[in-house]
C-alpha cells in the first residue's frame, strides 16, 4: 500500500506499463506460435511470411525492453533456421 502521493503515482504508472507489456508479449507469443505452425505444416511461403512477422514482433519487443535482446535474437535465429530448413526441403 502506497503511503505517499508519489508512490501512488508510480504504482499507477507501473500498472499502465505492465498492461502495455503484457499486450506486446502476447502479440509476440501469437506471432511465434503462428510461425511454428506454418513451419511444421511445411508450406515454404507461409512459413517465410509467418517468420518475417514473428521476427518483426520480437525485434520490436526487444527494442522496447519487453523481451531481452539476447532472448529475442535466440528465438529469431531458431525460427530462421527452421524456416530455412522448410524452404530447402521444397
From Swiss-Prot:
Question: Region Disordered: what ranges?
Answer: 1-29
Q: Which PANTHER family does UniProt cross-reference here?
A: 30S RIBOSOMAL PROTEIN S20, SMALL RIBOSOMAL SUBUNIT PROTEIN BS20C
Q: Which domain of life is it from?
A: Bacteria
Database matches in InterPro entries: Ribosomal_bS20, Ribosomal_bS20_sf
Species name: Anaeromyxobacter sp. (strain Fw109-5)
A GO cellular component annotation in the UniProt record: cytosol
Family named by the database record = Belongs to the bacterial ribosomal protein bS20 family.
HAMAP family for this protein: Ribosomal_bS20 (MF_00500)
Question: What's the name of the protein?
Answer: Small ribosomal subunit protein bS20
Sorted alphabetically, the Gene Ontology BP terms of this entry are: translation
Ordered alphabetically, the record's keywords are: Ribonucleoprotein, Ribosomal protein, RNA-binding, rRNA-binding
Instruction: Enumerate the transmembrane spans.
Output: none
Q: Name one Pfam family in it.
A: Ribosomal_S20p
So what does this one do? Answer: Binds directly to 16S ribosomal RNA.
Q: Name one GO molecular function term.
A: structural constituent of ribosome
Amino acid at each position: 500500500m502506497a503511503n505517499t502521493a508519489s508512490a501512488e503515482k508510480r504504482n499507477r504508472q507501473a500498472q499502465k506499463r505492465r498492461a502495455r507489456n503484457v499486450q506486446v508479449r502476447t502479440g509476440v507469443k501469437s506471432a511465434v506460435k503462428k510461425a511454428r505452425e506454418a513451419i511444421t505444416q511445411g508450406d515454404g511461403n507461409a512459413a517465410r511470411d509467418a517468420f518475417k512477422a514473428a521476427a518483426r514482433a520480437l525485434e520490436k519487443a526487444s527494442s522496447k525492453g519487453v523481451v531481452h535482446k539476447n532472448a529475442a535474437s535466440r528465438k529469431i535465429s531458431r525460427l530462421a533456421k527452421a524456416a530455412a530448413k522448410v524452404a530447402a526441403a521444397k
